Amino acid sequence: MNILKILILLELIYTCVSGLSFTVTSKIYMDVKHQKKPLGRIVFGLFGKRAPKTVTNFRHICLRGINGTTYVGSEFHRVISRFLIQGGDIVNNDGTGSTSIYGDFFQDEALDVEHLRPGYLGMANRGPDTNGCQFYVTTVAAQWLNGKHTVFGKVIEGMDTVYAIEDVKTDTDDHPIDPVIIVNCGEMPTEPYEFYPDDFSILGWIKAAGLPFCSSFIVLMIFHYFFRQLNMYC
């Protein structure tokens, strides 16, 4: 019985830790300016295992572009205080365009990742399975987006730059009065590693670990039952 308790404890620890982490497979940076002055750099850790198609598309646009057009020169065209900053329209630069390496649109991924803290990187869309080139970064917890948008990364450096973008003056349509422009983007070398965001609440901990732990617990209890039954007849 002691062995069973140890196995259950180890399984609980494993499922809890794995459920609350993301594997960062690559890091992309963007340098941003406003009113001809540098605002700073944002570094994104991308979740290539959770959202492989989305990460591949995002990296390709950053590094190679589509028909030669990358994110360089595009704007953060939508800025809403206490919500998000949005950019990446390499077609029209105003939020109306869409393109990707898969066509105009591609399917959703990683809809189970929740917007529990600022700094999550997600795909802007027009409804289910309408991802393209536009992306957003949350500046607050935004749970109302959960299940509706592909979340494929998180800011790991440069939230001060994100907040600086959030603070620029906008018009009544949430467009910055003076453009906020991506002047450079690229990739930072990294080996895949586990990233633990700072959004661990007790509820999130239970939600992440509960189902896999219960499943494992049931399997272990069934195994233990049959093991005892075998011992009774030996």
UniProtKB/Swiss-Prot annotation:
Gene3D superfamilies: Cyclophilin-like. It holds the Pfam family Pro_isomerase. GO terms for molecular function: cyclosporin A binding; peptidyl-prolyl cis-trans isomerase activity. GO terms for biological process: protein folding; visual perception. It is found in: Membrane. Keywords: Glycoprotein, Isomerase, Membrane, Rotamase, Sensory transduction, Signal, Transmembrane, Transmembrane helix, Vision. It is a single-pass membrane protein. Its main location: membrane. The keyword Secreted does not apply. PROSITE patterns: CSA_PPIASE_1 (PS00170), CSA_PPIASE_2 (PS50072). Residues 29-187 form the PPIase cyclophilin-type domain. GO terms for cellular component: cytoplasm; intracellular membrane-bounded organelle; membrane. It catalyses: [protein]-peptidylproline (omega=180) = [protein]-peptidylproline (omega=0). Its EC number is 5.2.1.8. Glycans are attached at N67. Residues 1-19 form the signal peptide. Expressed specifically in photoreceptor cells. The chain crosses the membrane at residues 202-222. PPIases accelerate the folding of proteins. It catalyzes the cis-trans isomerization of proline imidic peptide bonds in oligopeptides. Acts on the folding of rhodopsin RH1 and RH2 (but not RH3) and is required for visual transduction. Belongs to the cyclophilin-type PPIase family. This is Peptidyl-prolyl cis-trans isomerase, rhodopsin-specific isozyme. The lineage of its organism: Eukaryota, Metazoa, Ecdysozoa, Arthropoda, Hexapoda.
